[in-house]
C-alpha cells in the first residue's frame, strides 16, 4: 500500500491491475483508514483516470449484493448528486415515467447528499420499503417492471471506505462512483453529473462497464440533471462510440424555466411534488420531469430523438401509466 501511495504522491497513474488489487484489499478490510484516506486524496490531487475509475467500479460492483432476476434489459437514471441545487427529486420522478413507458427501471439511489431529500428519502415517504432482501427485490422487479435498490444496503463493502471519506470531508473518486456500480448488469443508463468536464470520461467508464447505450448529462449551473434554465450538455454512448452534444430549451421545443421554480423541500414535500407530476398537474416540476424522462427514453433507445422522447413522456403521464407504476411499487415493495 505504501508503494501505491508513493506513486500517487509522484503524480503517477495506477494501472488497472494495481487499482483492482488495492480496492480488493480495501473492501475486504485489509487496509487502515488512514491509508484509504491517503489513497483517495492522492487520486484526487493527481486526477483520476478512466482506467482507475473503471477498476474501482468493477471491484465495487463485484462486491455488491446480486438481485436474482430473469430481466436482462434493466435501465437506471441515477445521478451523482451533490450539485447543491436543492431541486425536487427529478430522476426519481422521471423513473416512474420511464417505467410507465415500458422500460424496466431498476432505480439505484441513496439518502440525501446536497438536498433535503434524496431518492431513498422521498420513496420512503411514499411508503416504499427500503430494506427488502435481494430475493424479494428481484420478485418486485419481475412483477412490476420497476424496483428501488437502496445503495446503502446493496453495497456492504462501502463500510470500509465511508470513515475515510467522512474524515476527508471533500469530494473524491467515490462521489463519481455511485451510479457506476449498479448491482444489475444494466443494458442502458441515463447518468447525471454536476461535472460537465467529466461527461466523456464517464461515458468511457460506462462503455467499459458493458453498457450498450447511455447518456451522461450535466445541466446548466452544475445541475446533475437536464435543466430548463440554460444549456444542457451530454455525452452519448451509441454503438461503442461517444459523441458530445448540447441543447437549449428552445432547441427541443421547450420554454425556459428558472432554477428557483424547481426547488424542492423535505421528503414529505417532495413526495407531494412527485405525486402532482405523475397526476399530470401543470407546473415547472412537470416540465422538468418531462424533459428528463424524454432524455431517458432517448438514452434507452425507446425514442430516436430527445424531442420524440419528450412527446412520449407527456403521453405516458397523461395516460396515467406513470402514476400506475408508483401504485404498483407501493403495493409490491412494502
From Swiss-Prot:
Its EC number is 2.4.2.18. It comes from Streptococcus gordonii (strain Challis / ATCC 35105 / BCRC 15272 / CH1 / DL1 / V288). It is an enzyme of class 2 (transferase). The keyword Amino-acid biosynthesis applies. This is Anthranilate phosphoribosyltransferase. 5-phospho-alpha-D-ribose 1-diphosphate binds at residues 79, 82-83, 87, 89-92, 107-115, 119. Mg(2+) 2 binds at residues 224-225. Anthranilate 2 binds at residue 165.
Amino acid at each position: 500500500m505504501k508503494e501505491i501511495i508513493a506513486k500517487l504522491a509522484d503524480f503517477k497513474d495506477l494501472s488497472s491491475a494495481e487499482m483492482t488489487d488495492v480496492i480488493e484489499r480495501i473492501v475486504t478490510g485489509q487496509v487502515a483508514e488512514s491509508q484509504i484516506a491517503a489513497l483517495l486524496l492522492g487520486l484526487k490531487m493527481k486526477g483520476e483516470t478512466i482506467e482507475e475509475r473503471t477498476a474501482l467500479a468493477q471491484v465495487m460492483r463485484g462486491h455488491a449484493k446480486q438481485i436474482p432476476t430473469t430481466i436482462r434489459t434493466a435501465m437506471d437514471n441515477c445521478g451523482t448528486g451533490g450539485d447543491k441545487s436543492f431541486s425536487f427529486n427529478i430522476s426519481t420522478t422521471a423513473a416512474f415515467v420511464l417505467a410507465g413507458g415500458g422500460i424496466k427501471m431498476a432505480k439505484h439511489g441513496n439518502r440525501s447528499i446536497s438536498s433535503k431529500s434524496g431518492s431513498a428519502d422521498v420513496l420512503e415517504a411514499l411508503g416504499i420499503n427500503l430494506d427488502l432482501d435481494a430475493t424479494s427485490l428481484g420478485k418486485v422487479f419481475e412483477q412490476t417492471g420497476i424496483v428501488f435498490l437502496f445503495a446503502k444496503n446493496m453495497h456492504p463493502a462501502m463500510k470500509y471506505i465511508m470513515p475515510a471519506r467522512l474524515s476527508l470531508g471533500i469530494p473524491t473518486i467515490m462521489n463519481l462512483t455511485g451510479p457506476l456500480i449498479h448491482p444489475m448488469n444494466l443494458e442502458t443508463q441515463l447518468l447525471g453529473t454536476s461535472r460537465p468536464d467529466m461527461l466523456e470520461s464517464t461515458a468511457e467508464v460506462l462503455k467499459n462497464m458493458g453498457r450498450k447505450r447511455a447518456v451522461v448529462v450535466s445541466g446548466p449551473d452544475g445541475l446533475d440533471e437536464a435543466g430548463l434554465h440554460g444549456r444542457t450538455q451530454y455525452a452519448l454512448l451509441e454503438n461503442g462510440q461517444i459523441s458530445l452534444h448540447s441543447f437549449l430549451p428552445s432547441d427541443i421545443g421547450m420554454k425556459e424555466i428558472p432554477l428557483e421554480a424547481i426547488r424542492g423541500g423535505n421528503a414529505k414535500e417532495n413526495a407531494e411534488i412527485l405525486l402532482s407530476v405523475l397526476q399530470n398537474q401543470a407546473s415547472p416540476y412537470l416540465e422538468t420531469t418531462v424533459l428528463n424522462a424524454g432524455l431517458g427514453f432517448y438514452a434507452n433507445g425507446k425514442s430516436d430523438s430527445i424531442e420524440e422522447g419528450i412527446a412520449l413522456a407527456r403521453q405516458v403521464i397523461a395516460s396515467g401509466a406513470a402514476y400506475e407504476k408508483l401504485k404498483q411499487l407501493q403495493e409490491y415493495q412494502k
